[in-house]
Amino acid sequence: MLTIKNWQLLSDNDKRRCLSRPRDNSAIKENVLEIINQVQLSGDKALYDLTKRFDRVNLQYLQISQEKIRQASIPQNALIAIKQAIETISSYHQFLLPENTEISTASGITIRNVYRPIQKVGLYVPGGNKTPLVSSLLMQAIPAKVAGCPIKVLCTPPDAEGEINEHILVAARLCGIDTIYAIGGAQAIAAMAYGTESVIKVDKIFGPGNSYVTQAKTLVAIDADGAAIDMPAGPSEVMILADTEANPEFIAADLLAQAEHGPDSQVILICDECELANQVNQQLEIQMSYLSRIEFIKQSLTNSRIIICSNQSEQLDIINSYAPEHLIINRKNPEPWVEKIVAAGTVFLGSWAAETMGDYVTGSNHVLPTSGFARNHSGLSTLDFMTRFTVQAINQEAIRNLGPAAMTLAELEGLDAHANAVQIRLNTLGD
């Protein structure tokens, strides 16, 4: 079960270790670079070869036909659930859609903010046939659709027969995606970043993945010929702040829900007293007995812990220092805490706010910054699928009134051609 640490008894070094995250020490950068180079050099052939090597699949084709997308069908209960999720996710991301605005900063000057959809976006959904991560697709495809991105490309790993799970195909169809490739891993990221004979080169790549996918996204993002990415990615995590009135059964369930993501996931509980910590550990043992992903959970819990800390100021310091992907405030009166949180991917308030709901159906996006990146990154939103540029209108009055200031600043920086561009206009205006 989870190790229990008393915060007040820890040294500063022990406190840092207590909040440290599991690290992937595998040296994969060179392997990923090799994959990227192979895709750049050999295009489609590399994709077929790499899929055979990593997925053990002899693909007959890379792109899923329009007929297969149209004919895909799933059980009615799954279809209803997907449509319900689409409705809430669409509502929230429509709410985030920005409006073009205009301001006059001085007499004769107006500046407009103009938003445009990114023209070509690449969506990556990991998992393959056994675990169709429909929610991951919805969280990317819906804001892309709301933003108005005209070209949306989906890459996801094939099953043993080289096909895509029909739940993914149906969800993609409902979200208006008709360009789907049966490609996974780092090779999928490389294909979308650089393009091949079959795969469209995109402007920005979205979506989670394993360490190879994450490394590939990082590498293509720093290449001027590659593609931008949504955000740095890492293992899933949750931090729960609970008081003595919190239900230990609920707490344990939320911890396990995050732990089952993978062996490198991390869960941390902050609570006031040791009694609740022990009750949660008991519940973890009970609930683990009937869950299916037990090996992932066991490994994840070795990276995780319970922190006993009753000082509210210190509790806030822990939260803001850790900057969790998911924060659950399971306290009697959670709302006042929100004003003091400065770093979190998303915050759930109260006993009934199961993190699972946010993963699927509240409408908020579940693609969130991990590994402490919530200090300087936000969760995925409609804005991530858009660009903004300014439109500046400047008339004669503005040149006359502010031109001399612009010239002075240009000359201060030794840029006489800058100053000249204004002086010529002032000369034309005369006195």
Curated annotation (Swiss-Prot):
<feature type="binding site">
    <location>
        <position position="258"/>
    </location>
    <ligand>
        <name>Zn(2+)</name>
    </ligand>
</feature>
<dbReference type="InterPro" id="IPR012131">
    <property type="entry name" value="Hstdl_DH"/>
</dbReference>
<dbReference type="GO" id="GO:0000105">
    <property type="term" value="P:L-histidine biosynthetic process"/>
</dbReference>
<dbReference type="GO" id="GO:0008270">
    <property type="term" value="F:zinc ion binding"/>
</dbReference>
<feature type="binding site">
    <location>
        <position position="359"/>
    </location>
    <ligand>
        <name>Zn(2+)</name>
    </ligand>
</feature>
<feature type="binding site">
    <location>
        <position position="359"/>
    </location>
    <ligand>
        <name>substrate</name>
    </ligand>
</feature>
<feature type="binding site">
    <location>
        <position position="418"/>
    </location>
    <ligand>
        <name>substrate</name>
    </ligand>
</feature>
<feature type="binding site">
    <location>
        <position position="326"/>
    </location>
    <ligand>
        <name>substrate</name>
    </ligand>
</feature>
<comment type="pathway">
    <text>Amino-acid biosynthesis; L-histidine biosynthesis; L-histidine from 5-phospho-alpha-D-ribose 1-diphosphate: step 9/9.</text>
</comment>
<feature type="binding site">
    <location>
        <position position="418"/>
    </location>
    <ligand>
        <name>Zn(2+)</name>
    </ligand>
</feature>
<feature type="binding site">
    <location>
        <position position="187"/>
    </location>
    <ligand>
        <name>NAD(+)</name>
    </ligand>
</feature>
<dbReference type="GO" id="GO:0051287">
    <property type="term" value="F:NAD binding"/>
</dbReference>
<feature type="binding site">
    <location>
        <position position="258"/>
    </location>
    <ligand>
        <name>substrate</name>
    </ligand>
</feature>
<keyword id="KW-0862">Zinc</keyword>
<dbReference type="GO" id="GO:0005829">
    <property type="term" value="C:cytosol"/>
</dbReference>
<feature type="binding site">
    <location>
        <position position="261"/>
    </location>
    <ligand>
        <name>Zn(2+)</name>
    </ligand>
</feature>
<feature type="active site" description="Proton acceptor">
    <location>
        <position position="326"/>
    </location>
</feature>
<keyword id="KW-0028">Amino-acid biosynthesis</keyword>
<comment type="similarity">
    <text>Belongs to the histidinol dehydrogenase family.</text>
</comment>
<protein>
    <recommendedName>
        <fullName>Histidinol dehydrogenase</fullName>
        <ecNumber>1.1.1.23</ecNumber>
    </recommendedName>
</protein>
<feature type="binding site">
    <location>
        <position position="210"/>
    </location>
    <ligand>
        <name>NAD(+)</name>
    </ligand>
</feature>
<feature type="binding site">
    <location>
        <position position="124"/>
    </location>
    <ligand>
        <name>NAD(+)</name>
    </ligand>
</feature>
<feature type="binding site">
    <location>
        <position position="261"/>
    </location>
    <ligand>
        <name>substrate</name>
    </ligand>
</feature>
<dbReference type="InterPro" id="IPR016161">
    <property type="entry name" value="Ald_DH/histidinol_DH"/>
</dbReference>
<comment type="function">
    <text>Catalyzes the sequential NAD-dependent oxidations of L-histidinol to L-histidinaldehyde and then to L-histidine.</text>
</comment>
<feature type="binding site">
    <location>
        <position position="413"/>
    </location>
    <ligand>
        <name>substrate</name>
    </ligand>
</feature>
<keyword id="KW-0368">Histidine biosynthesis</keyword>
<keyword id="KW-0520">NAD</keyword>
<feature type="active site" description="Proton acceptor">
    <location>
        <position position="325"/>
    </location>
</feature>
<feature type="binding site">
    <location>
        <position position="236"/>
    </location>
    <ligand>
        <name>substrate</name>
    </ligand>
</feature>
<dbReference type="Pfam" id="PF00815">
    <property type="entry name" value="Histidinol_dh"/>
</dbReference>
<dbReference type="GO" id="GO:0004399">
    <property type="term" value="F:histidinol dehydrogenase activity"/>
</dbReference>
<keyword id="KW-0479">Metal-binding</keyword>
<dbReference type="InterPro" id="IPR001692">
    <property type="entry name" value="Histidinol_DH_CS"/>
</dbReference>
<keyword id="KW-0560">Oxidoreductase</keyword>
<dbReference type="InterPro" id="IPR022695">
    <property type="entry name" value="Histidinol_DH_monofunct"/>
</dbReference>
